[in-house]
């Protein structure tokens, strides 16, 4: 199988030193799993994956636990059947749901290997390009978990290794046993904690950062404004950023971003994602969606650059935030 390369699109970026090149916007498939997103259906989900591919996104991210029975991976397997040679597929292992849809962490090597094999079967793949430890298991050393990834590399079931939701100490311990090529942390205009220590370490060790939540669960897409009424079952209501002073601070940021969007002729979401994917150390930003128009919009963040005056204004807006 040919490796996706930079010749397919000039702005593709390399994951670590792997020779695997990806678009600066990736499709994140958590929303189509239907676990927390409302009004998800199979037809729209398949159309959304296809829209991502048609919009120039070659990087699709999923996980063993995206869906109580792996719905996300199964949909991806159907959608990419005729596109595999052009795509980079990432998945994750280490989390599963029980019959009561309660989440469990399991970082034992035998579990990680078994979950990888299940993911390969669901997506009808021979190899997963990038495979992450989804999160640390409090009962298993990350060093022990790392041994499974060495086994998966040696067996040809995965091409590159990543970790998600690990702190820097855990990353270093894992990396000492099995070298990592990418990490997947949250990062956006409202959450920049990784810049203190994590990004410098990644730059020093040639590790890519594939960030999730660039739009902070839709808040920075520009559609959720003051007075927005959330459905009672909307899981976003469990996040402090959607309440009180943090929410108002985000609204003030959006007020400023409106002006930049008008100036550039782009949407707020496109401005936010473009800024995010071009921050130092960021290789690709994961953008989810349950409808085709959503991923088409965020894919429109690729292929252009914010001017210096816009970047300076965004810096001022972020520095003025008051979010705990």
Where are these regions (language model features)?
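Conserved beta-strand positions
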Residues: 27-29, 62, 91, 130-133, ...
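Beta/alpha (TIM)-barrel catalytic core signal, keyed to glycine-rich beta->alpha loops juxtaposed to Asp/Glu
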Residues: 4, 136-323
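CE4/NodB-like, metal-dependent polysaccharide N-deacetylase domain
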Residues: 111-132
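N-terminal binding-site loop/beta-alpha segment at the start of enzyme catalytic domains
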Residues: 1-87
């Amino acid at each position: 199988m040919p490796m996706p390369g930079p010749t397919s699109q000039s702005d593709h970026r390399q994951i670590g030193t792997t020779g695997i090149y990806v678009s600066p916007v990736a499709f994140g498939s958590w929303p189509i799993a239907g676990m927390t997103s409302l009004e998800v259906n199979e037809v729209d989900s398949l159309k959304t994956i296809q829209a991502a591919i048609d919009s120039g996104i070659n990087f699709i991210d999923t996980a063993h636990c995206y869906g109580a029975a792996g719905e996300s991976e199964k949909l991806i397997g159907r959608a990419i059947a005729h596109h595999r040679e052009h795509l980079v597929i990432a998945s994750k292992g280490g989390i599963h749901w029980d019959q009561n849809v309660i989440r469990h962490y399991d970082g034992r090597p035998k579990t990680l290997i078994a979950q990888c094999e299940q993911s390969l079967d669901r997506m009808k793949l021979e190899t997963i390009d990038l495979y992450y430890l989804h999160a640390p298991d409090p009962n298993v050393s990350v060093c022990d978990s790392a041994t499974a990834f060495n086994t998966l590399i040696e067996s040809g079931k995965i091409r590159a290794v990543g970790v998600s939701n690990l702190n820097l100490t855990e990353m270093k311990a894992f990396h000492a046993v099995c070298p990592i090529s990418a990490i997947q942390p949250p990062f956006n205009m409202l959450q920049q904690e990784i810049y203190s220590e994590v990004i410098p370490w990644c730059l020093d060790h040639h590790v890519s950062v594939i960030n999730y939540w660039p739009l902070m669960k839709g808040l920075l897409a520009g559609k959720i404004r003051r007075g927005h009424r959330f459905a009672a079952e909307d899981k976003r209501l469990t996040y402090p950023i959607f309440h009180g002073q943090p929410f108002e601070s985000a609204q003030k940021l959006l007020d400023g971003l409106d002006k930049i969007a008008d100036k550039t002729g782009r949407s707020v979401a496109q401005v936010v994602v473009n800024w995010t994917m071009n921050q130092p150390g960021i290789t690709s930003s994961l953008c989810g969606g349950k409808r085709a128009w959503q991923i088409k919009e965020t894919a429109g963040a690729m292929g252009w650059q914010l001017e210096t005056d816009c970047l300076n204004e965004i810096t001022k807006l972020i520095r003025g935030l008051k979010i705990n």
